[in-house]
Amino acid sequence: MADIKDYKFWFVTGSQFLYGPEVLKQVEEDSKKIIEKLNESGNLPYPIEFKTVGVTAENITEAMKEANYDDSVAGVITWAHTFSPAKNWIRGTQLLNKPLLHLATQMLNNIPYDSIDFDYMNLNQSAHGDREYAFINARLRLNNKIVFGHWADEAVQVQIGKWMDVAVAYEESFKIKVVTFADKMRNVAVTDGDKIEAQIKFGWTVDYWGVGDLVTYVNAIDDADIDNLYIELQDKYDFVAGQNDSEKYEHNVKYQLREYLGIKRFLTDKGYSAFTTNFEDLVGLEQLPGLAAQLLMADGFGFAGEGDWKTAALTRLLKIVSHNQATAFMEDYTLDLRQGHEAILGSHMLEVDPTIASDKPRVEVHPLGIGGKEDPARLVFSGRTGDAVDVTISDFGDEFKLISYDVTGNKPEAETPYLPVAKQLWTPKAGLKAGAEGWLTVGGGHHTTLSFSVDSEQLTDLANLFGVTYVDIK
């Protein structure tokens, strides 16, 4: 996935001088041992580095200030090995502007009844120290994450790893730049929003560029590059001409590849990580980008149709959380309301992300009833089965809300010979009726990001970091 730097996390262990140098030495050794084992576990997507034992307000504050100014540090993990007077943490914690995880753990996972004494108690009093430390975080009204359990347990490691992905996404969010080629679809409400507030809250920069600026890039692509990509993609996808003659099919597919290479070069040259198109404004383009948009999403770029910059940025954000695994721009289209079959069929005109494909996508060319352009090439496939989340962001004037529900993904019950697009079937775990009523009541949009790799706990953590309301429909 393009343009995600190598991040790391710092580990700061709480203690105090009261216990003497030998105990502090042991605290550091234990901390380094835990970090070594965590890094070796294979459950963490980013490495942890030991930073310091926090024993005074001064050295804790210095560590947090250094974390702020080290761009390679995505967050800080803390643990109170011994008792750690929480007043020492106040200033440093106030200054920290990186994500914070409090790991409430213990060096050993048991109580050594046959050998325990007060020396052991002084060294291993995380149950005591973590409460003191957690209090000051609560008192400061922090949006920090708490993970409780033994550090060697896989479930704890997985939870830390998922939080790491959220923390990195939070840091990267302030680098997300969205280009809108033309404005949003005319007269549509939910795709609109306050771009200034979005930049304040999420760090998203949203810029308008005319389609003519894009056309210049598209027309400048070398034919040889298109020909090479056309051959390369035949190993990845099935090329199905169908009712098209071979000349038309090849031309229309290659034009989408021209658009793909042109848009990608534009995004790369100007530092954008997400984009939108609008079928109402395609002057100078032969086709609405379909296959082109799908290939760019597969590369990790965010996308949404009809100028929906919020969903384009959200899709990019969740692709960072998920490492671009099974995370796609989506739209609710039509319903199955029969008892025992309740489901939503999600799709879009063309642009569904192939990272959720369950079968080998087919490159097909078919007419498109809107846009007034040539028949666009697109990837056609069925989505996957399994647990997923469907997520949207809506702007209510006084606040943004992150809205989601858990869903069960399924494949369509039958083929759709007259609907040659990629599609995904799902049912809200709350039930179609309760899920739909909840979504409609809170004002969730019709454009979403559907992810089989992100969960509601991570969405909760994201909302907490950004300081926005999270509505999890159950």
From Swiss-Prot:
Stated family: Belongs to the arabinose isomerase family.
Catalysed reactions, semicolon-separated: beta-L-arabinopyranose = L-ribulose
Enzyme Commission number: 5.3.1.4
Source organism (scientific name): Leuconostoc mesenteroides subsp. mesenteroides (strain ATCC 8293 / DSM 20343 / BCRC 11652 / CCM 1803 / JCM 6124 / NCDO 523 / NBRC 100496 / NCIMB 8023 / NCTC 12954 / NRRL B-1118 / 37Y)
Manganese recorded as keyword: yes
NCBIfam families for this protein: PRK02929.1
A matching Pfam family: AraA_N
Gene: araA
Protein name, as recorded: L-arabinose isomerase
GO biological process: L-arabinose catabolic process to xylulose 5-phosphate
Cofactors demanded by this protein: Mn(2+)
Binding residue positions for Mn(2+): 306, 331, 348, 447
Matches recorded under InterPro entries: Ara_Isoase_C, AraA_central, AraA_N, AraA_N_sf, Fuc/Ara_isomerase_C, Fucose_isomerase_N/cen_sf, Lara_isomerase
Function (record text): Catalyzes the conversion of L-arabinose to L-ribulose.
Pathway the protein acts in: Carbohydrate degradation; L-arabinose degradation via L-ribulose; D-xylulose 5-phosphate from L-arabinose (bacterial route): step 1/3
Cofactor note: Binds 1 Mn(2+) ion per subunit.
